[in-house]
Amino acid sequence: MGIKGLNAIISEHVPSAIRKSDIKSFFGRKVAIDASMSLYQFLIAVRQQDGGQLTNEAGETTSHLMGMFYRTLRMIDNGIKPCYVFDGKPPDLKSHELTKRSSRRVETEKKLAEATTELEKMKQERRLVKVSKEHNEEAQKLLGLMGIPYIIAPTEAEAQCAELAKKGKVYAAASEDMDTLCYRTPFLLRHLTFSEAKKEPIHEIDTELVLRGLDLTIEQFVDLCIMLGCDYCESIRGVGPVTALKLIKTHGSIEKIVEFIESGESNNTKWKIPEDWPYKQARMLFLDPEVIDGNEINLKWSPPKEKELIEYLCDDKKFSEERVKSGISRLKKGLKSGIQGRLDGFFQVVPKTKEQLAAAAKRAQENKKLNKNKNKVTKGRR
């Protein structure tokens, strides 16, 4: 699910922390990718012309394999070395969220049964998409044959991706879930595995710039995210994103906010603190997640196992042999050529000061107003 409203807060208060770039900008980078999130995207987006999932002659779903194979090739073509991280066992605190998701599935199944148009059926079918154990195992087999490293995290994939980035094994964590920032990955890449046809730029979010720009410690930032709404527990009812940020900046922690509300000083009867609220446990899952120490992980990209890959994709899954062989050639070329060094690897990056961040944010707001005024003038001339 991620963190509700976090992207909007960062976009408004620290726009300079989000850099929008073409995939070519990440040439020479190693990236840890949230595999479970990617597989979900592929199952949703990689479809036949009639809107149904891709299947082979035996009726087995192949959308996830098609997406994994070709999106990985696209990264390799652009000089990126991807590694994938799969979810392990979900934390116990996530059981409430998983129960809610199961309830929503039951409701969606009812709506699907009642749907009268093909468009409505397709809409409900996509809401029922779920990454299964079999999908994960098939994707892991594919990656192994491609020579692309993957890791099965003890619990949350995003936490393990962040750990790899923090220990310098990769440049960034890639996921659509904004909660990846709570694990303090140096950089979060969003939209990396999107289809090229979408023409959506990759959003690179700098965690340190976010913290500096919001003037929050990582502990306060995590508390803000819990207040906004995360997968681990409920948030205070009646408190929206704007108020949540204001409360954290004023009081500094959830403990102080709870005291403020319970004392009656807030004069707001609409704010309701959840009963037995496990925010402290949620906080620790973000600040001290269960991960494999990044220093103990050795990521290795190997030549693809050409014969086995053709057997798996073409013989078993009925992919086009011509296209698969072409893909293997691209893969061999990309992995063999290695990764050239980047110029910025020779220089120390100096963090921006609060004054520089404020100036950048001011410039961004001024440019926004200027563009609005230009649009008004253009419309007036018409």
UniProtKB/Swiss-Prot annotation:
DNA damage is among the record's keywords: yes
Entry's Gene Ontology BP terms: base-excision repair; DNA replication, removal of RNA primer; double-strand break repair via nonhomologous end joining; gene conversion at mating-type locus; maintenance of DNA trinucleotide repeats
Protein family per UniProt: Belongs to the XPG/RAD2 endonuclease family. FEN1 subfamily.
Protein name: Flap endonuclease 1
UniProt subcellular location: Nucleus, Nucleolus; Nucleus, Nucleoplasm; Mitochondrion
Basic residues bias spans: 370-382
Record: residues binding DNA: R47, R71, E156, G229, D231
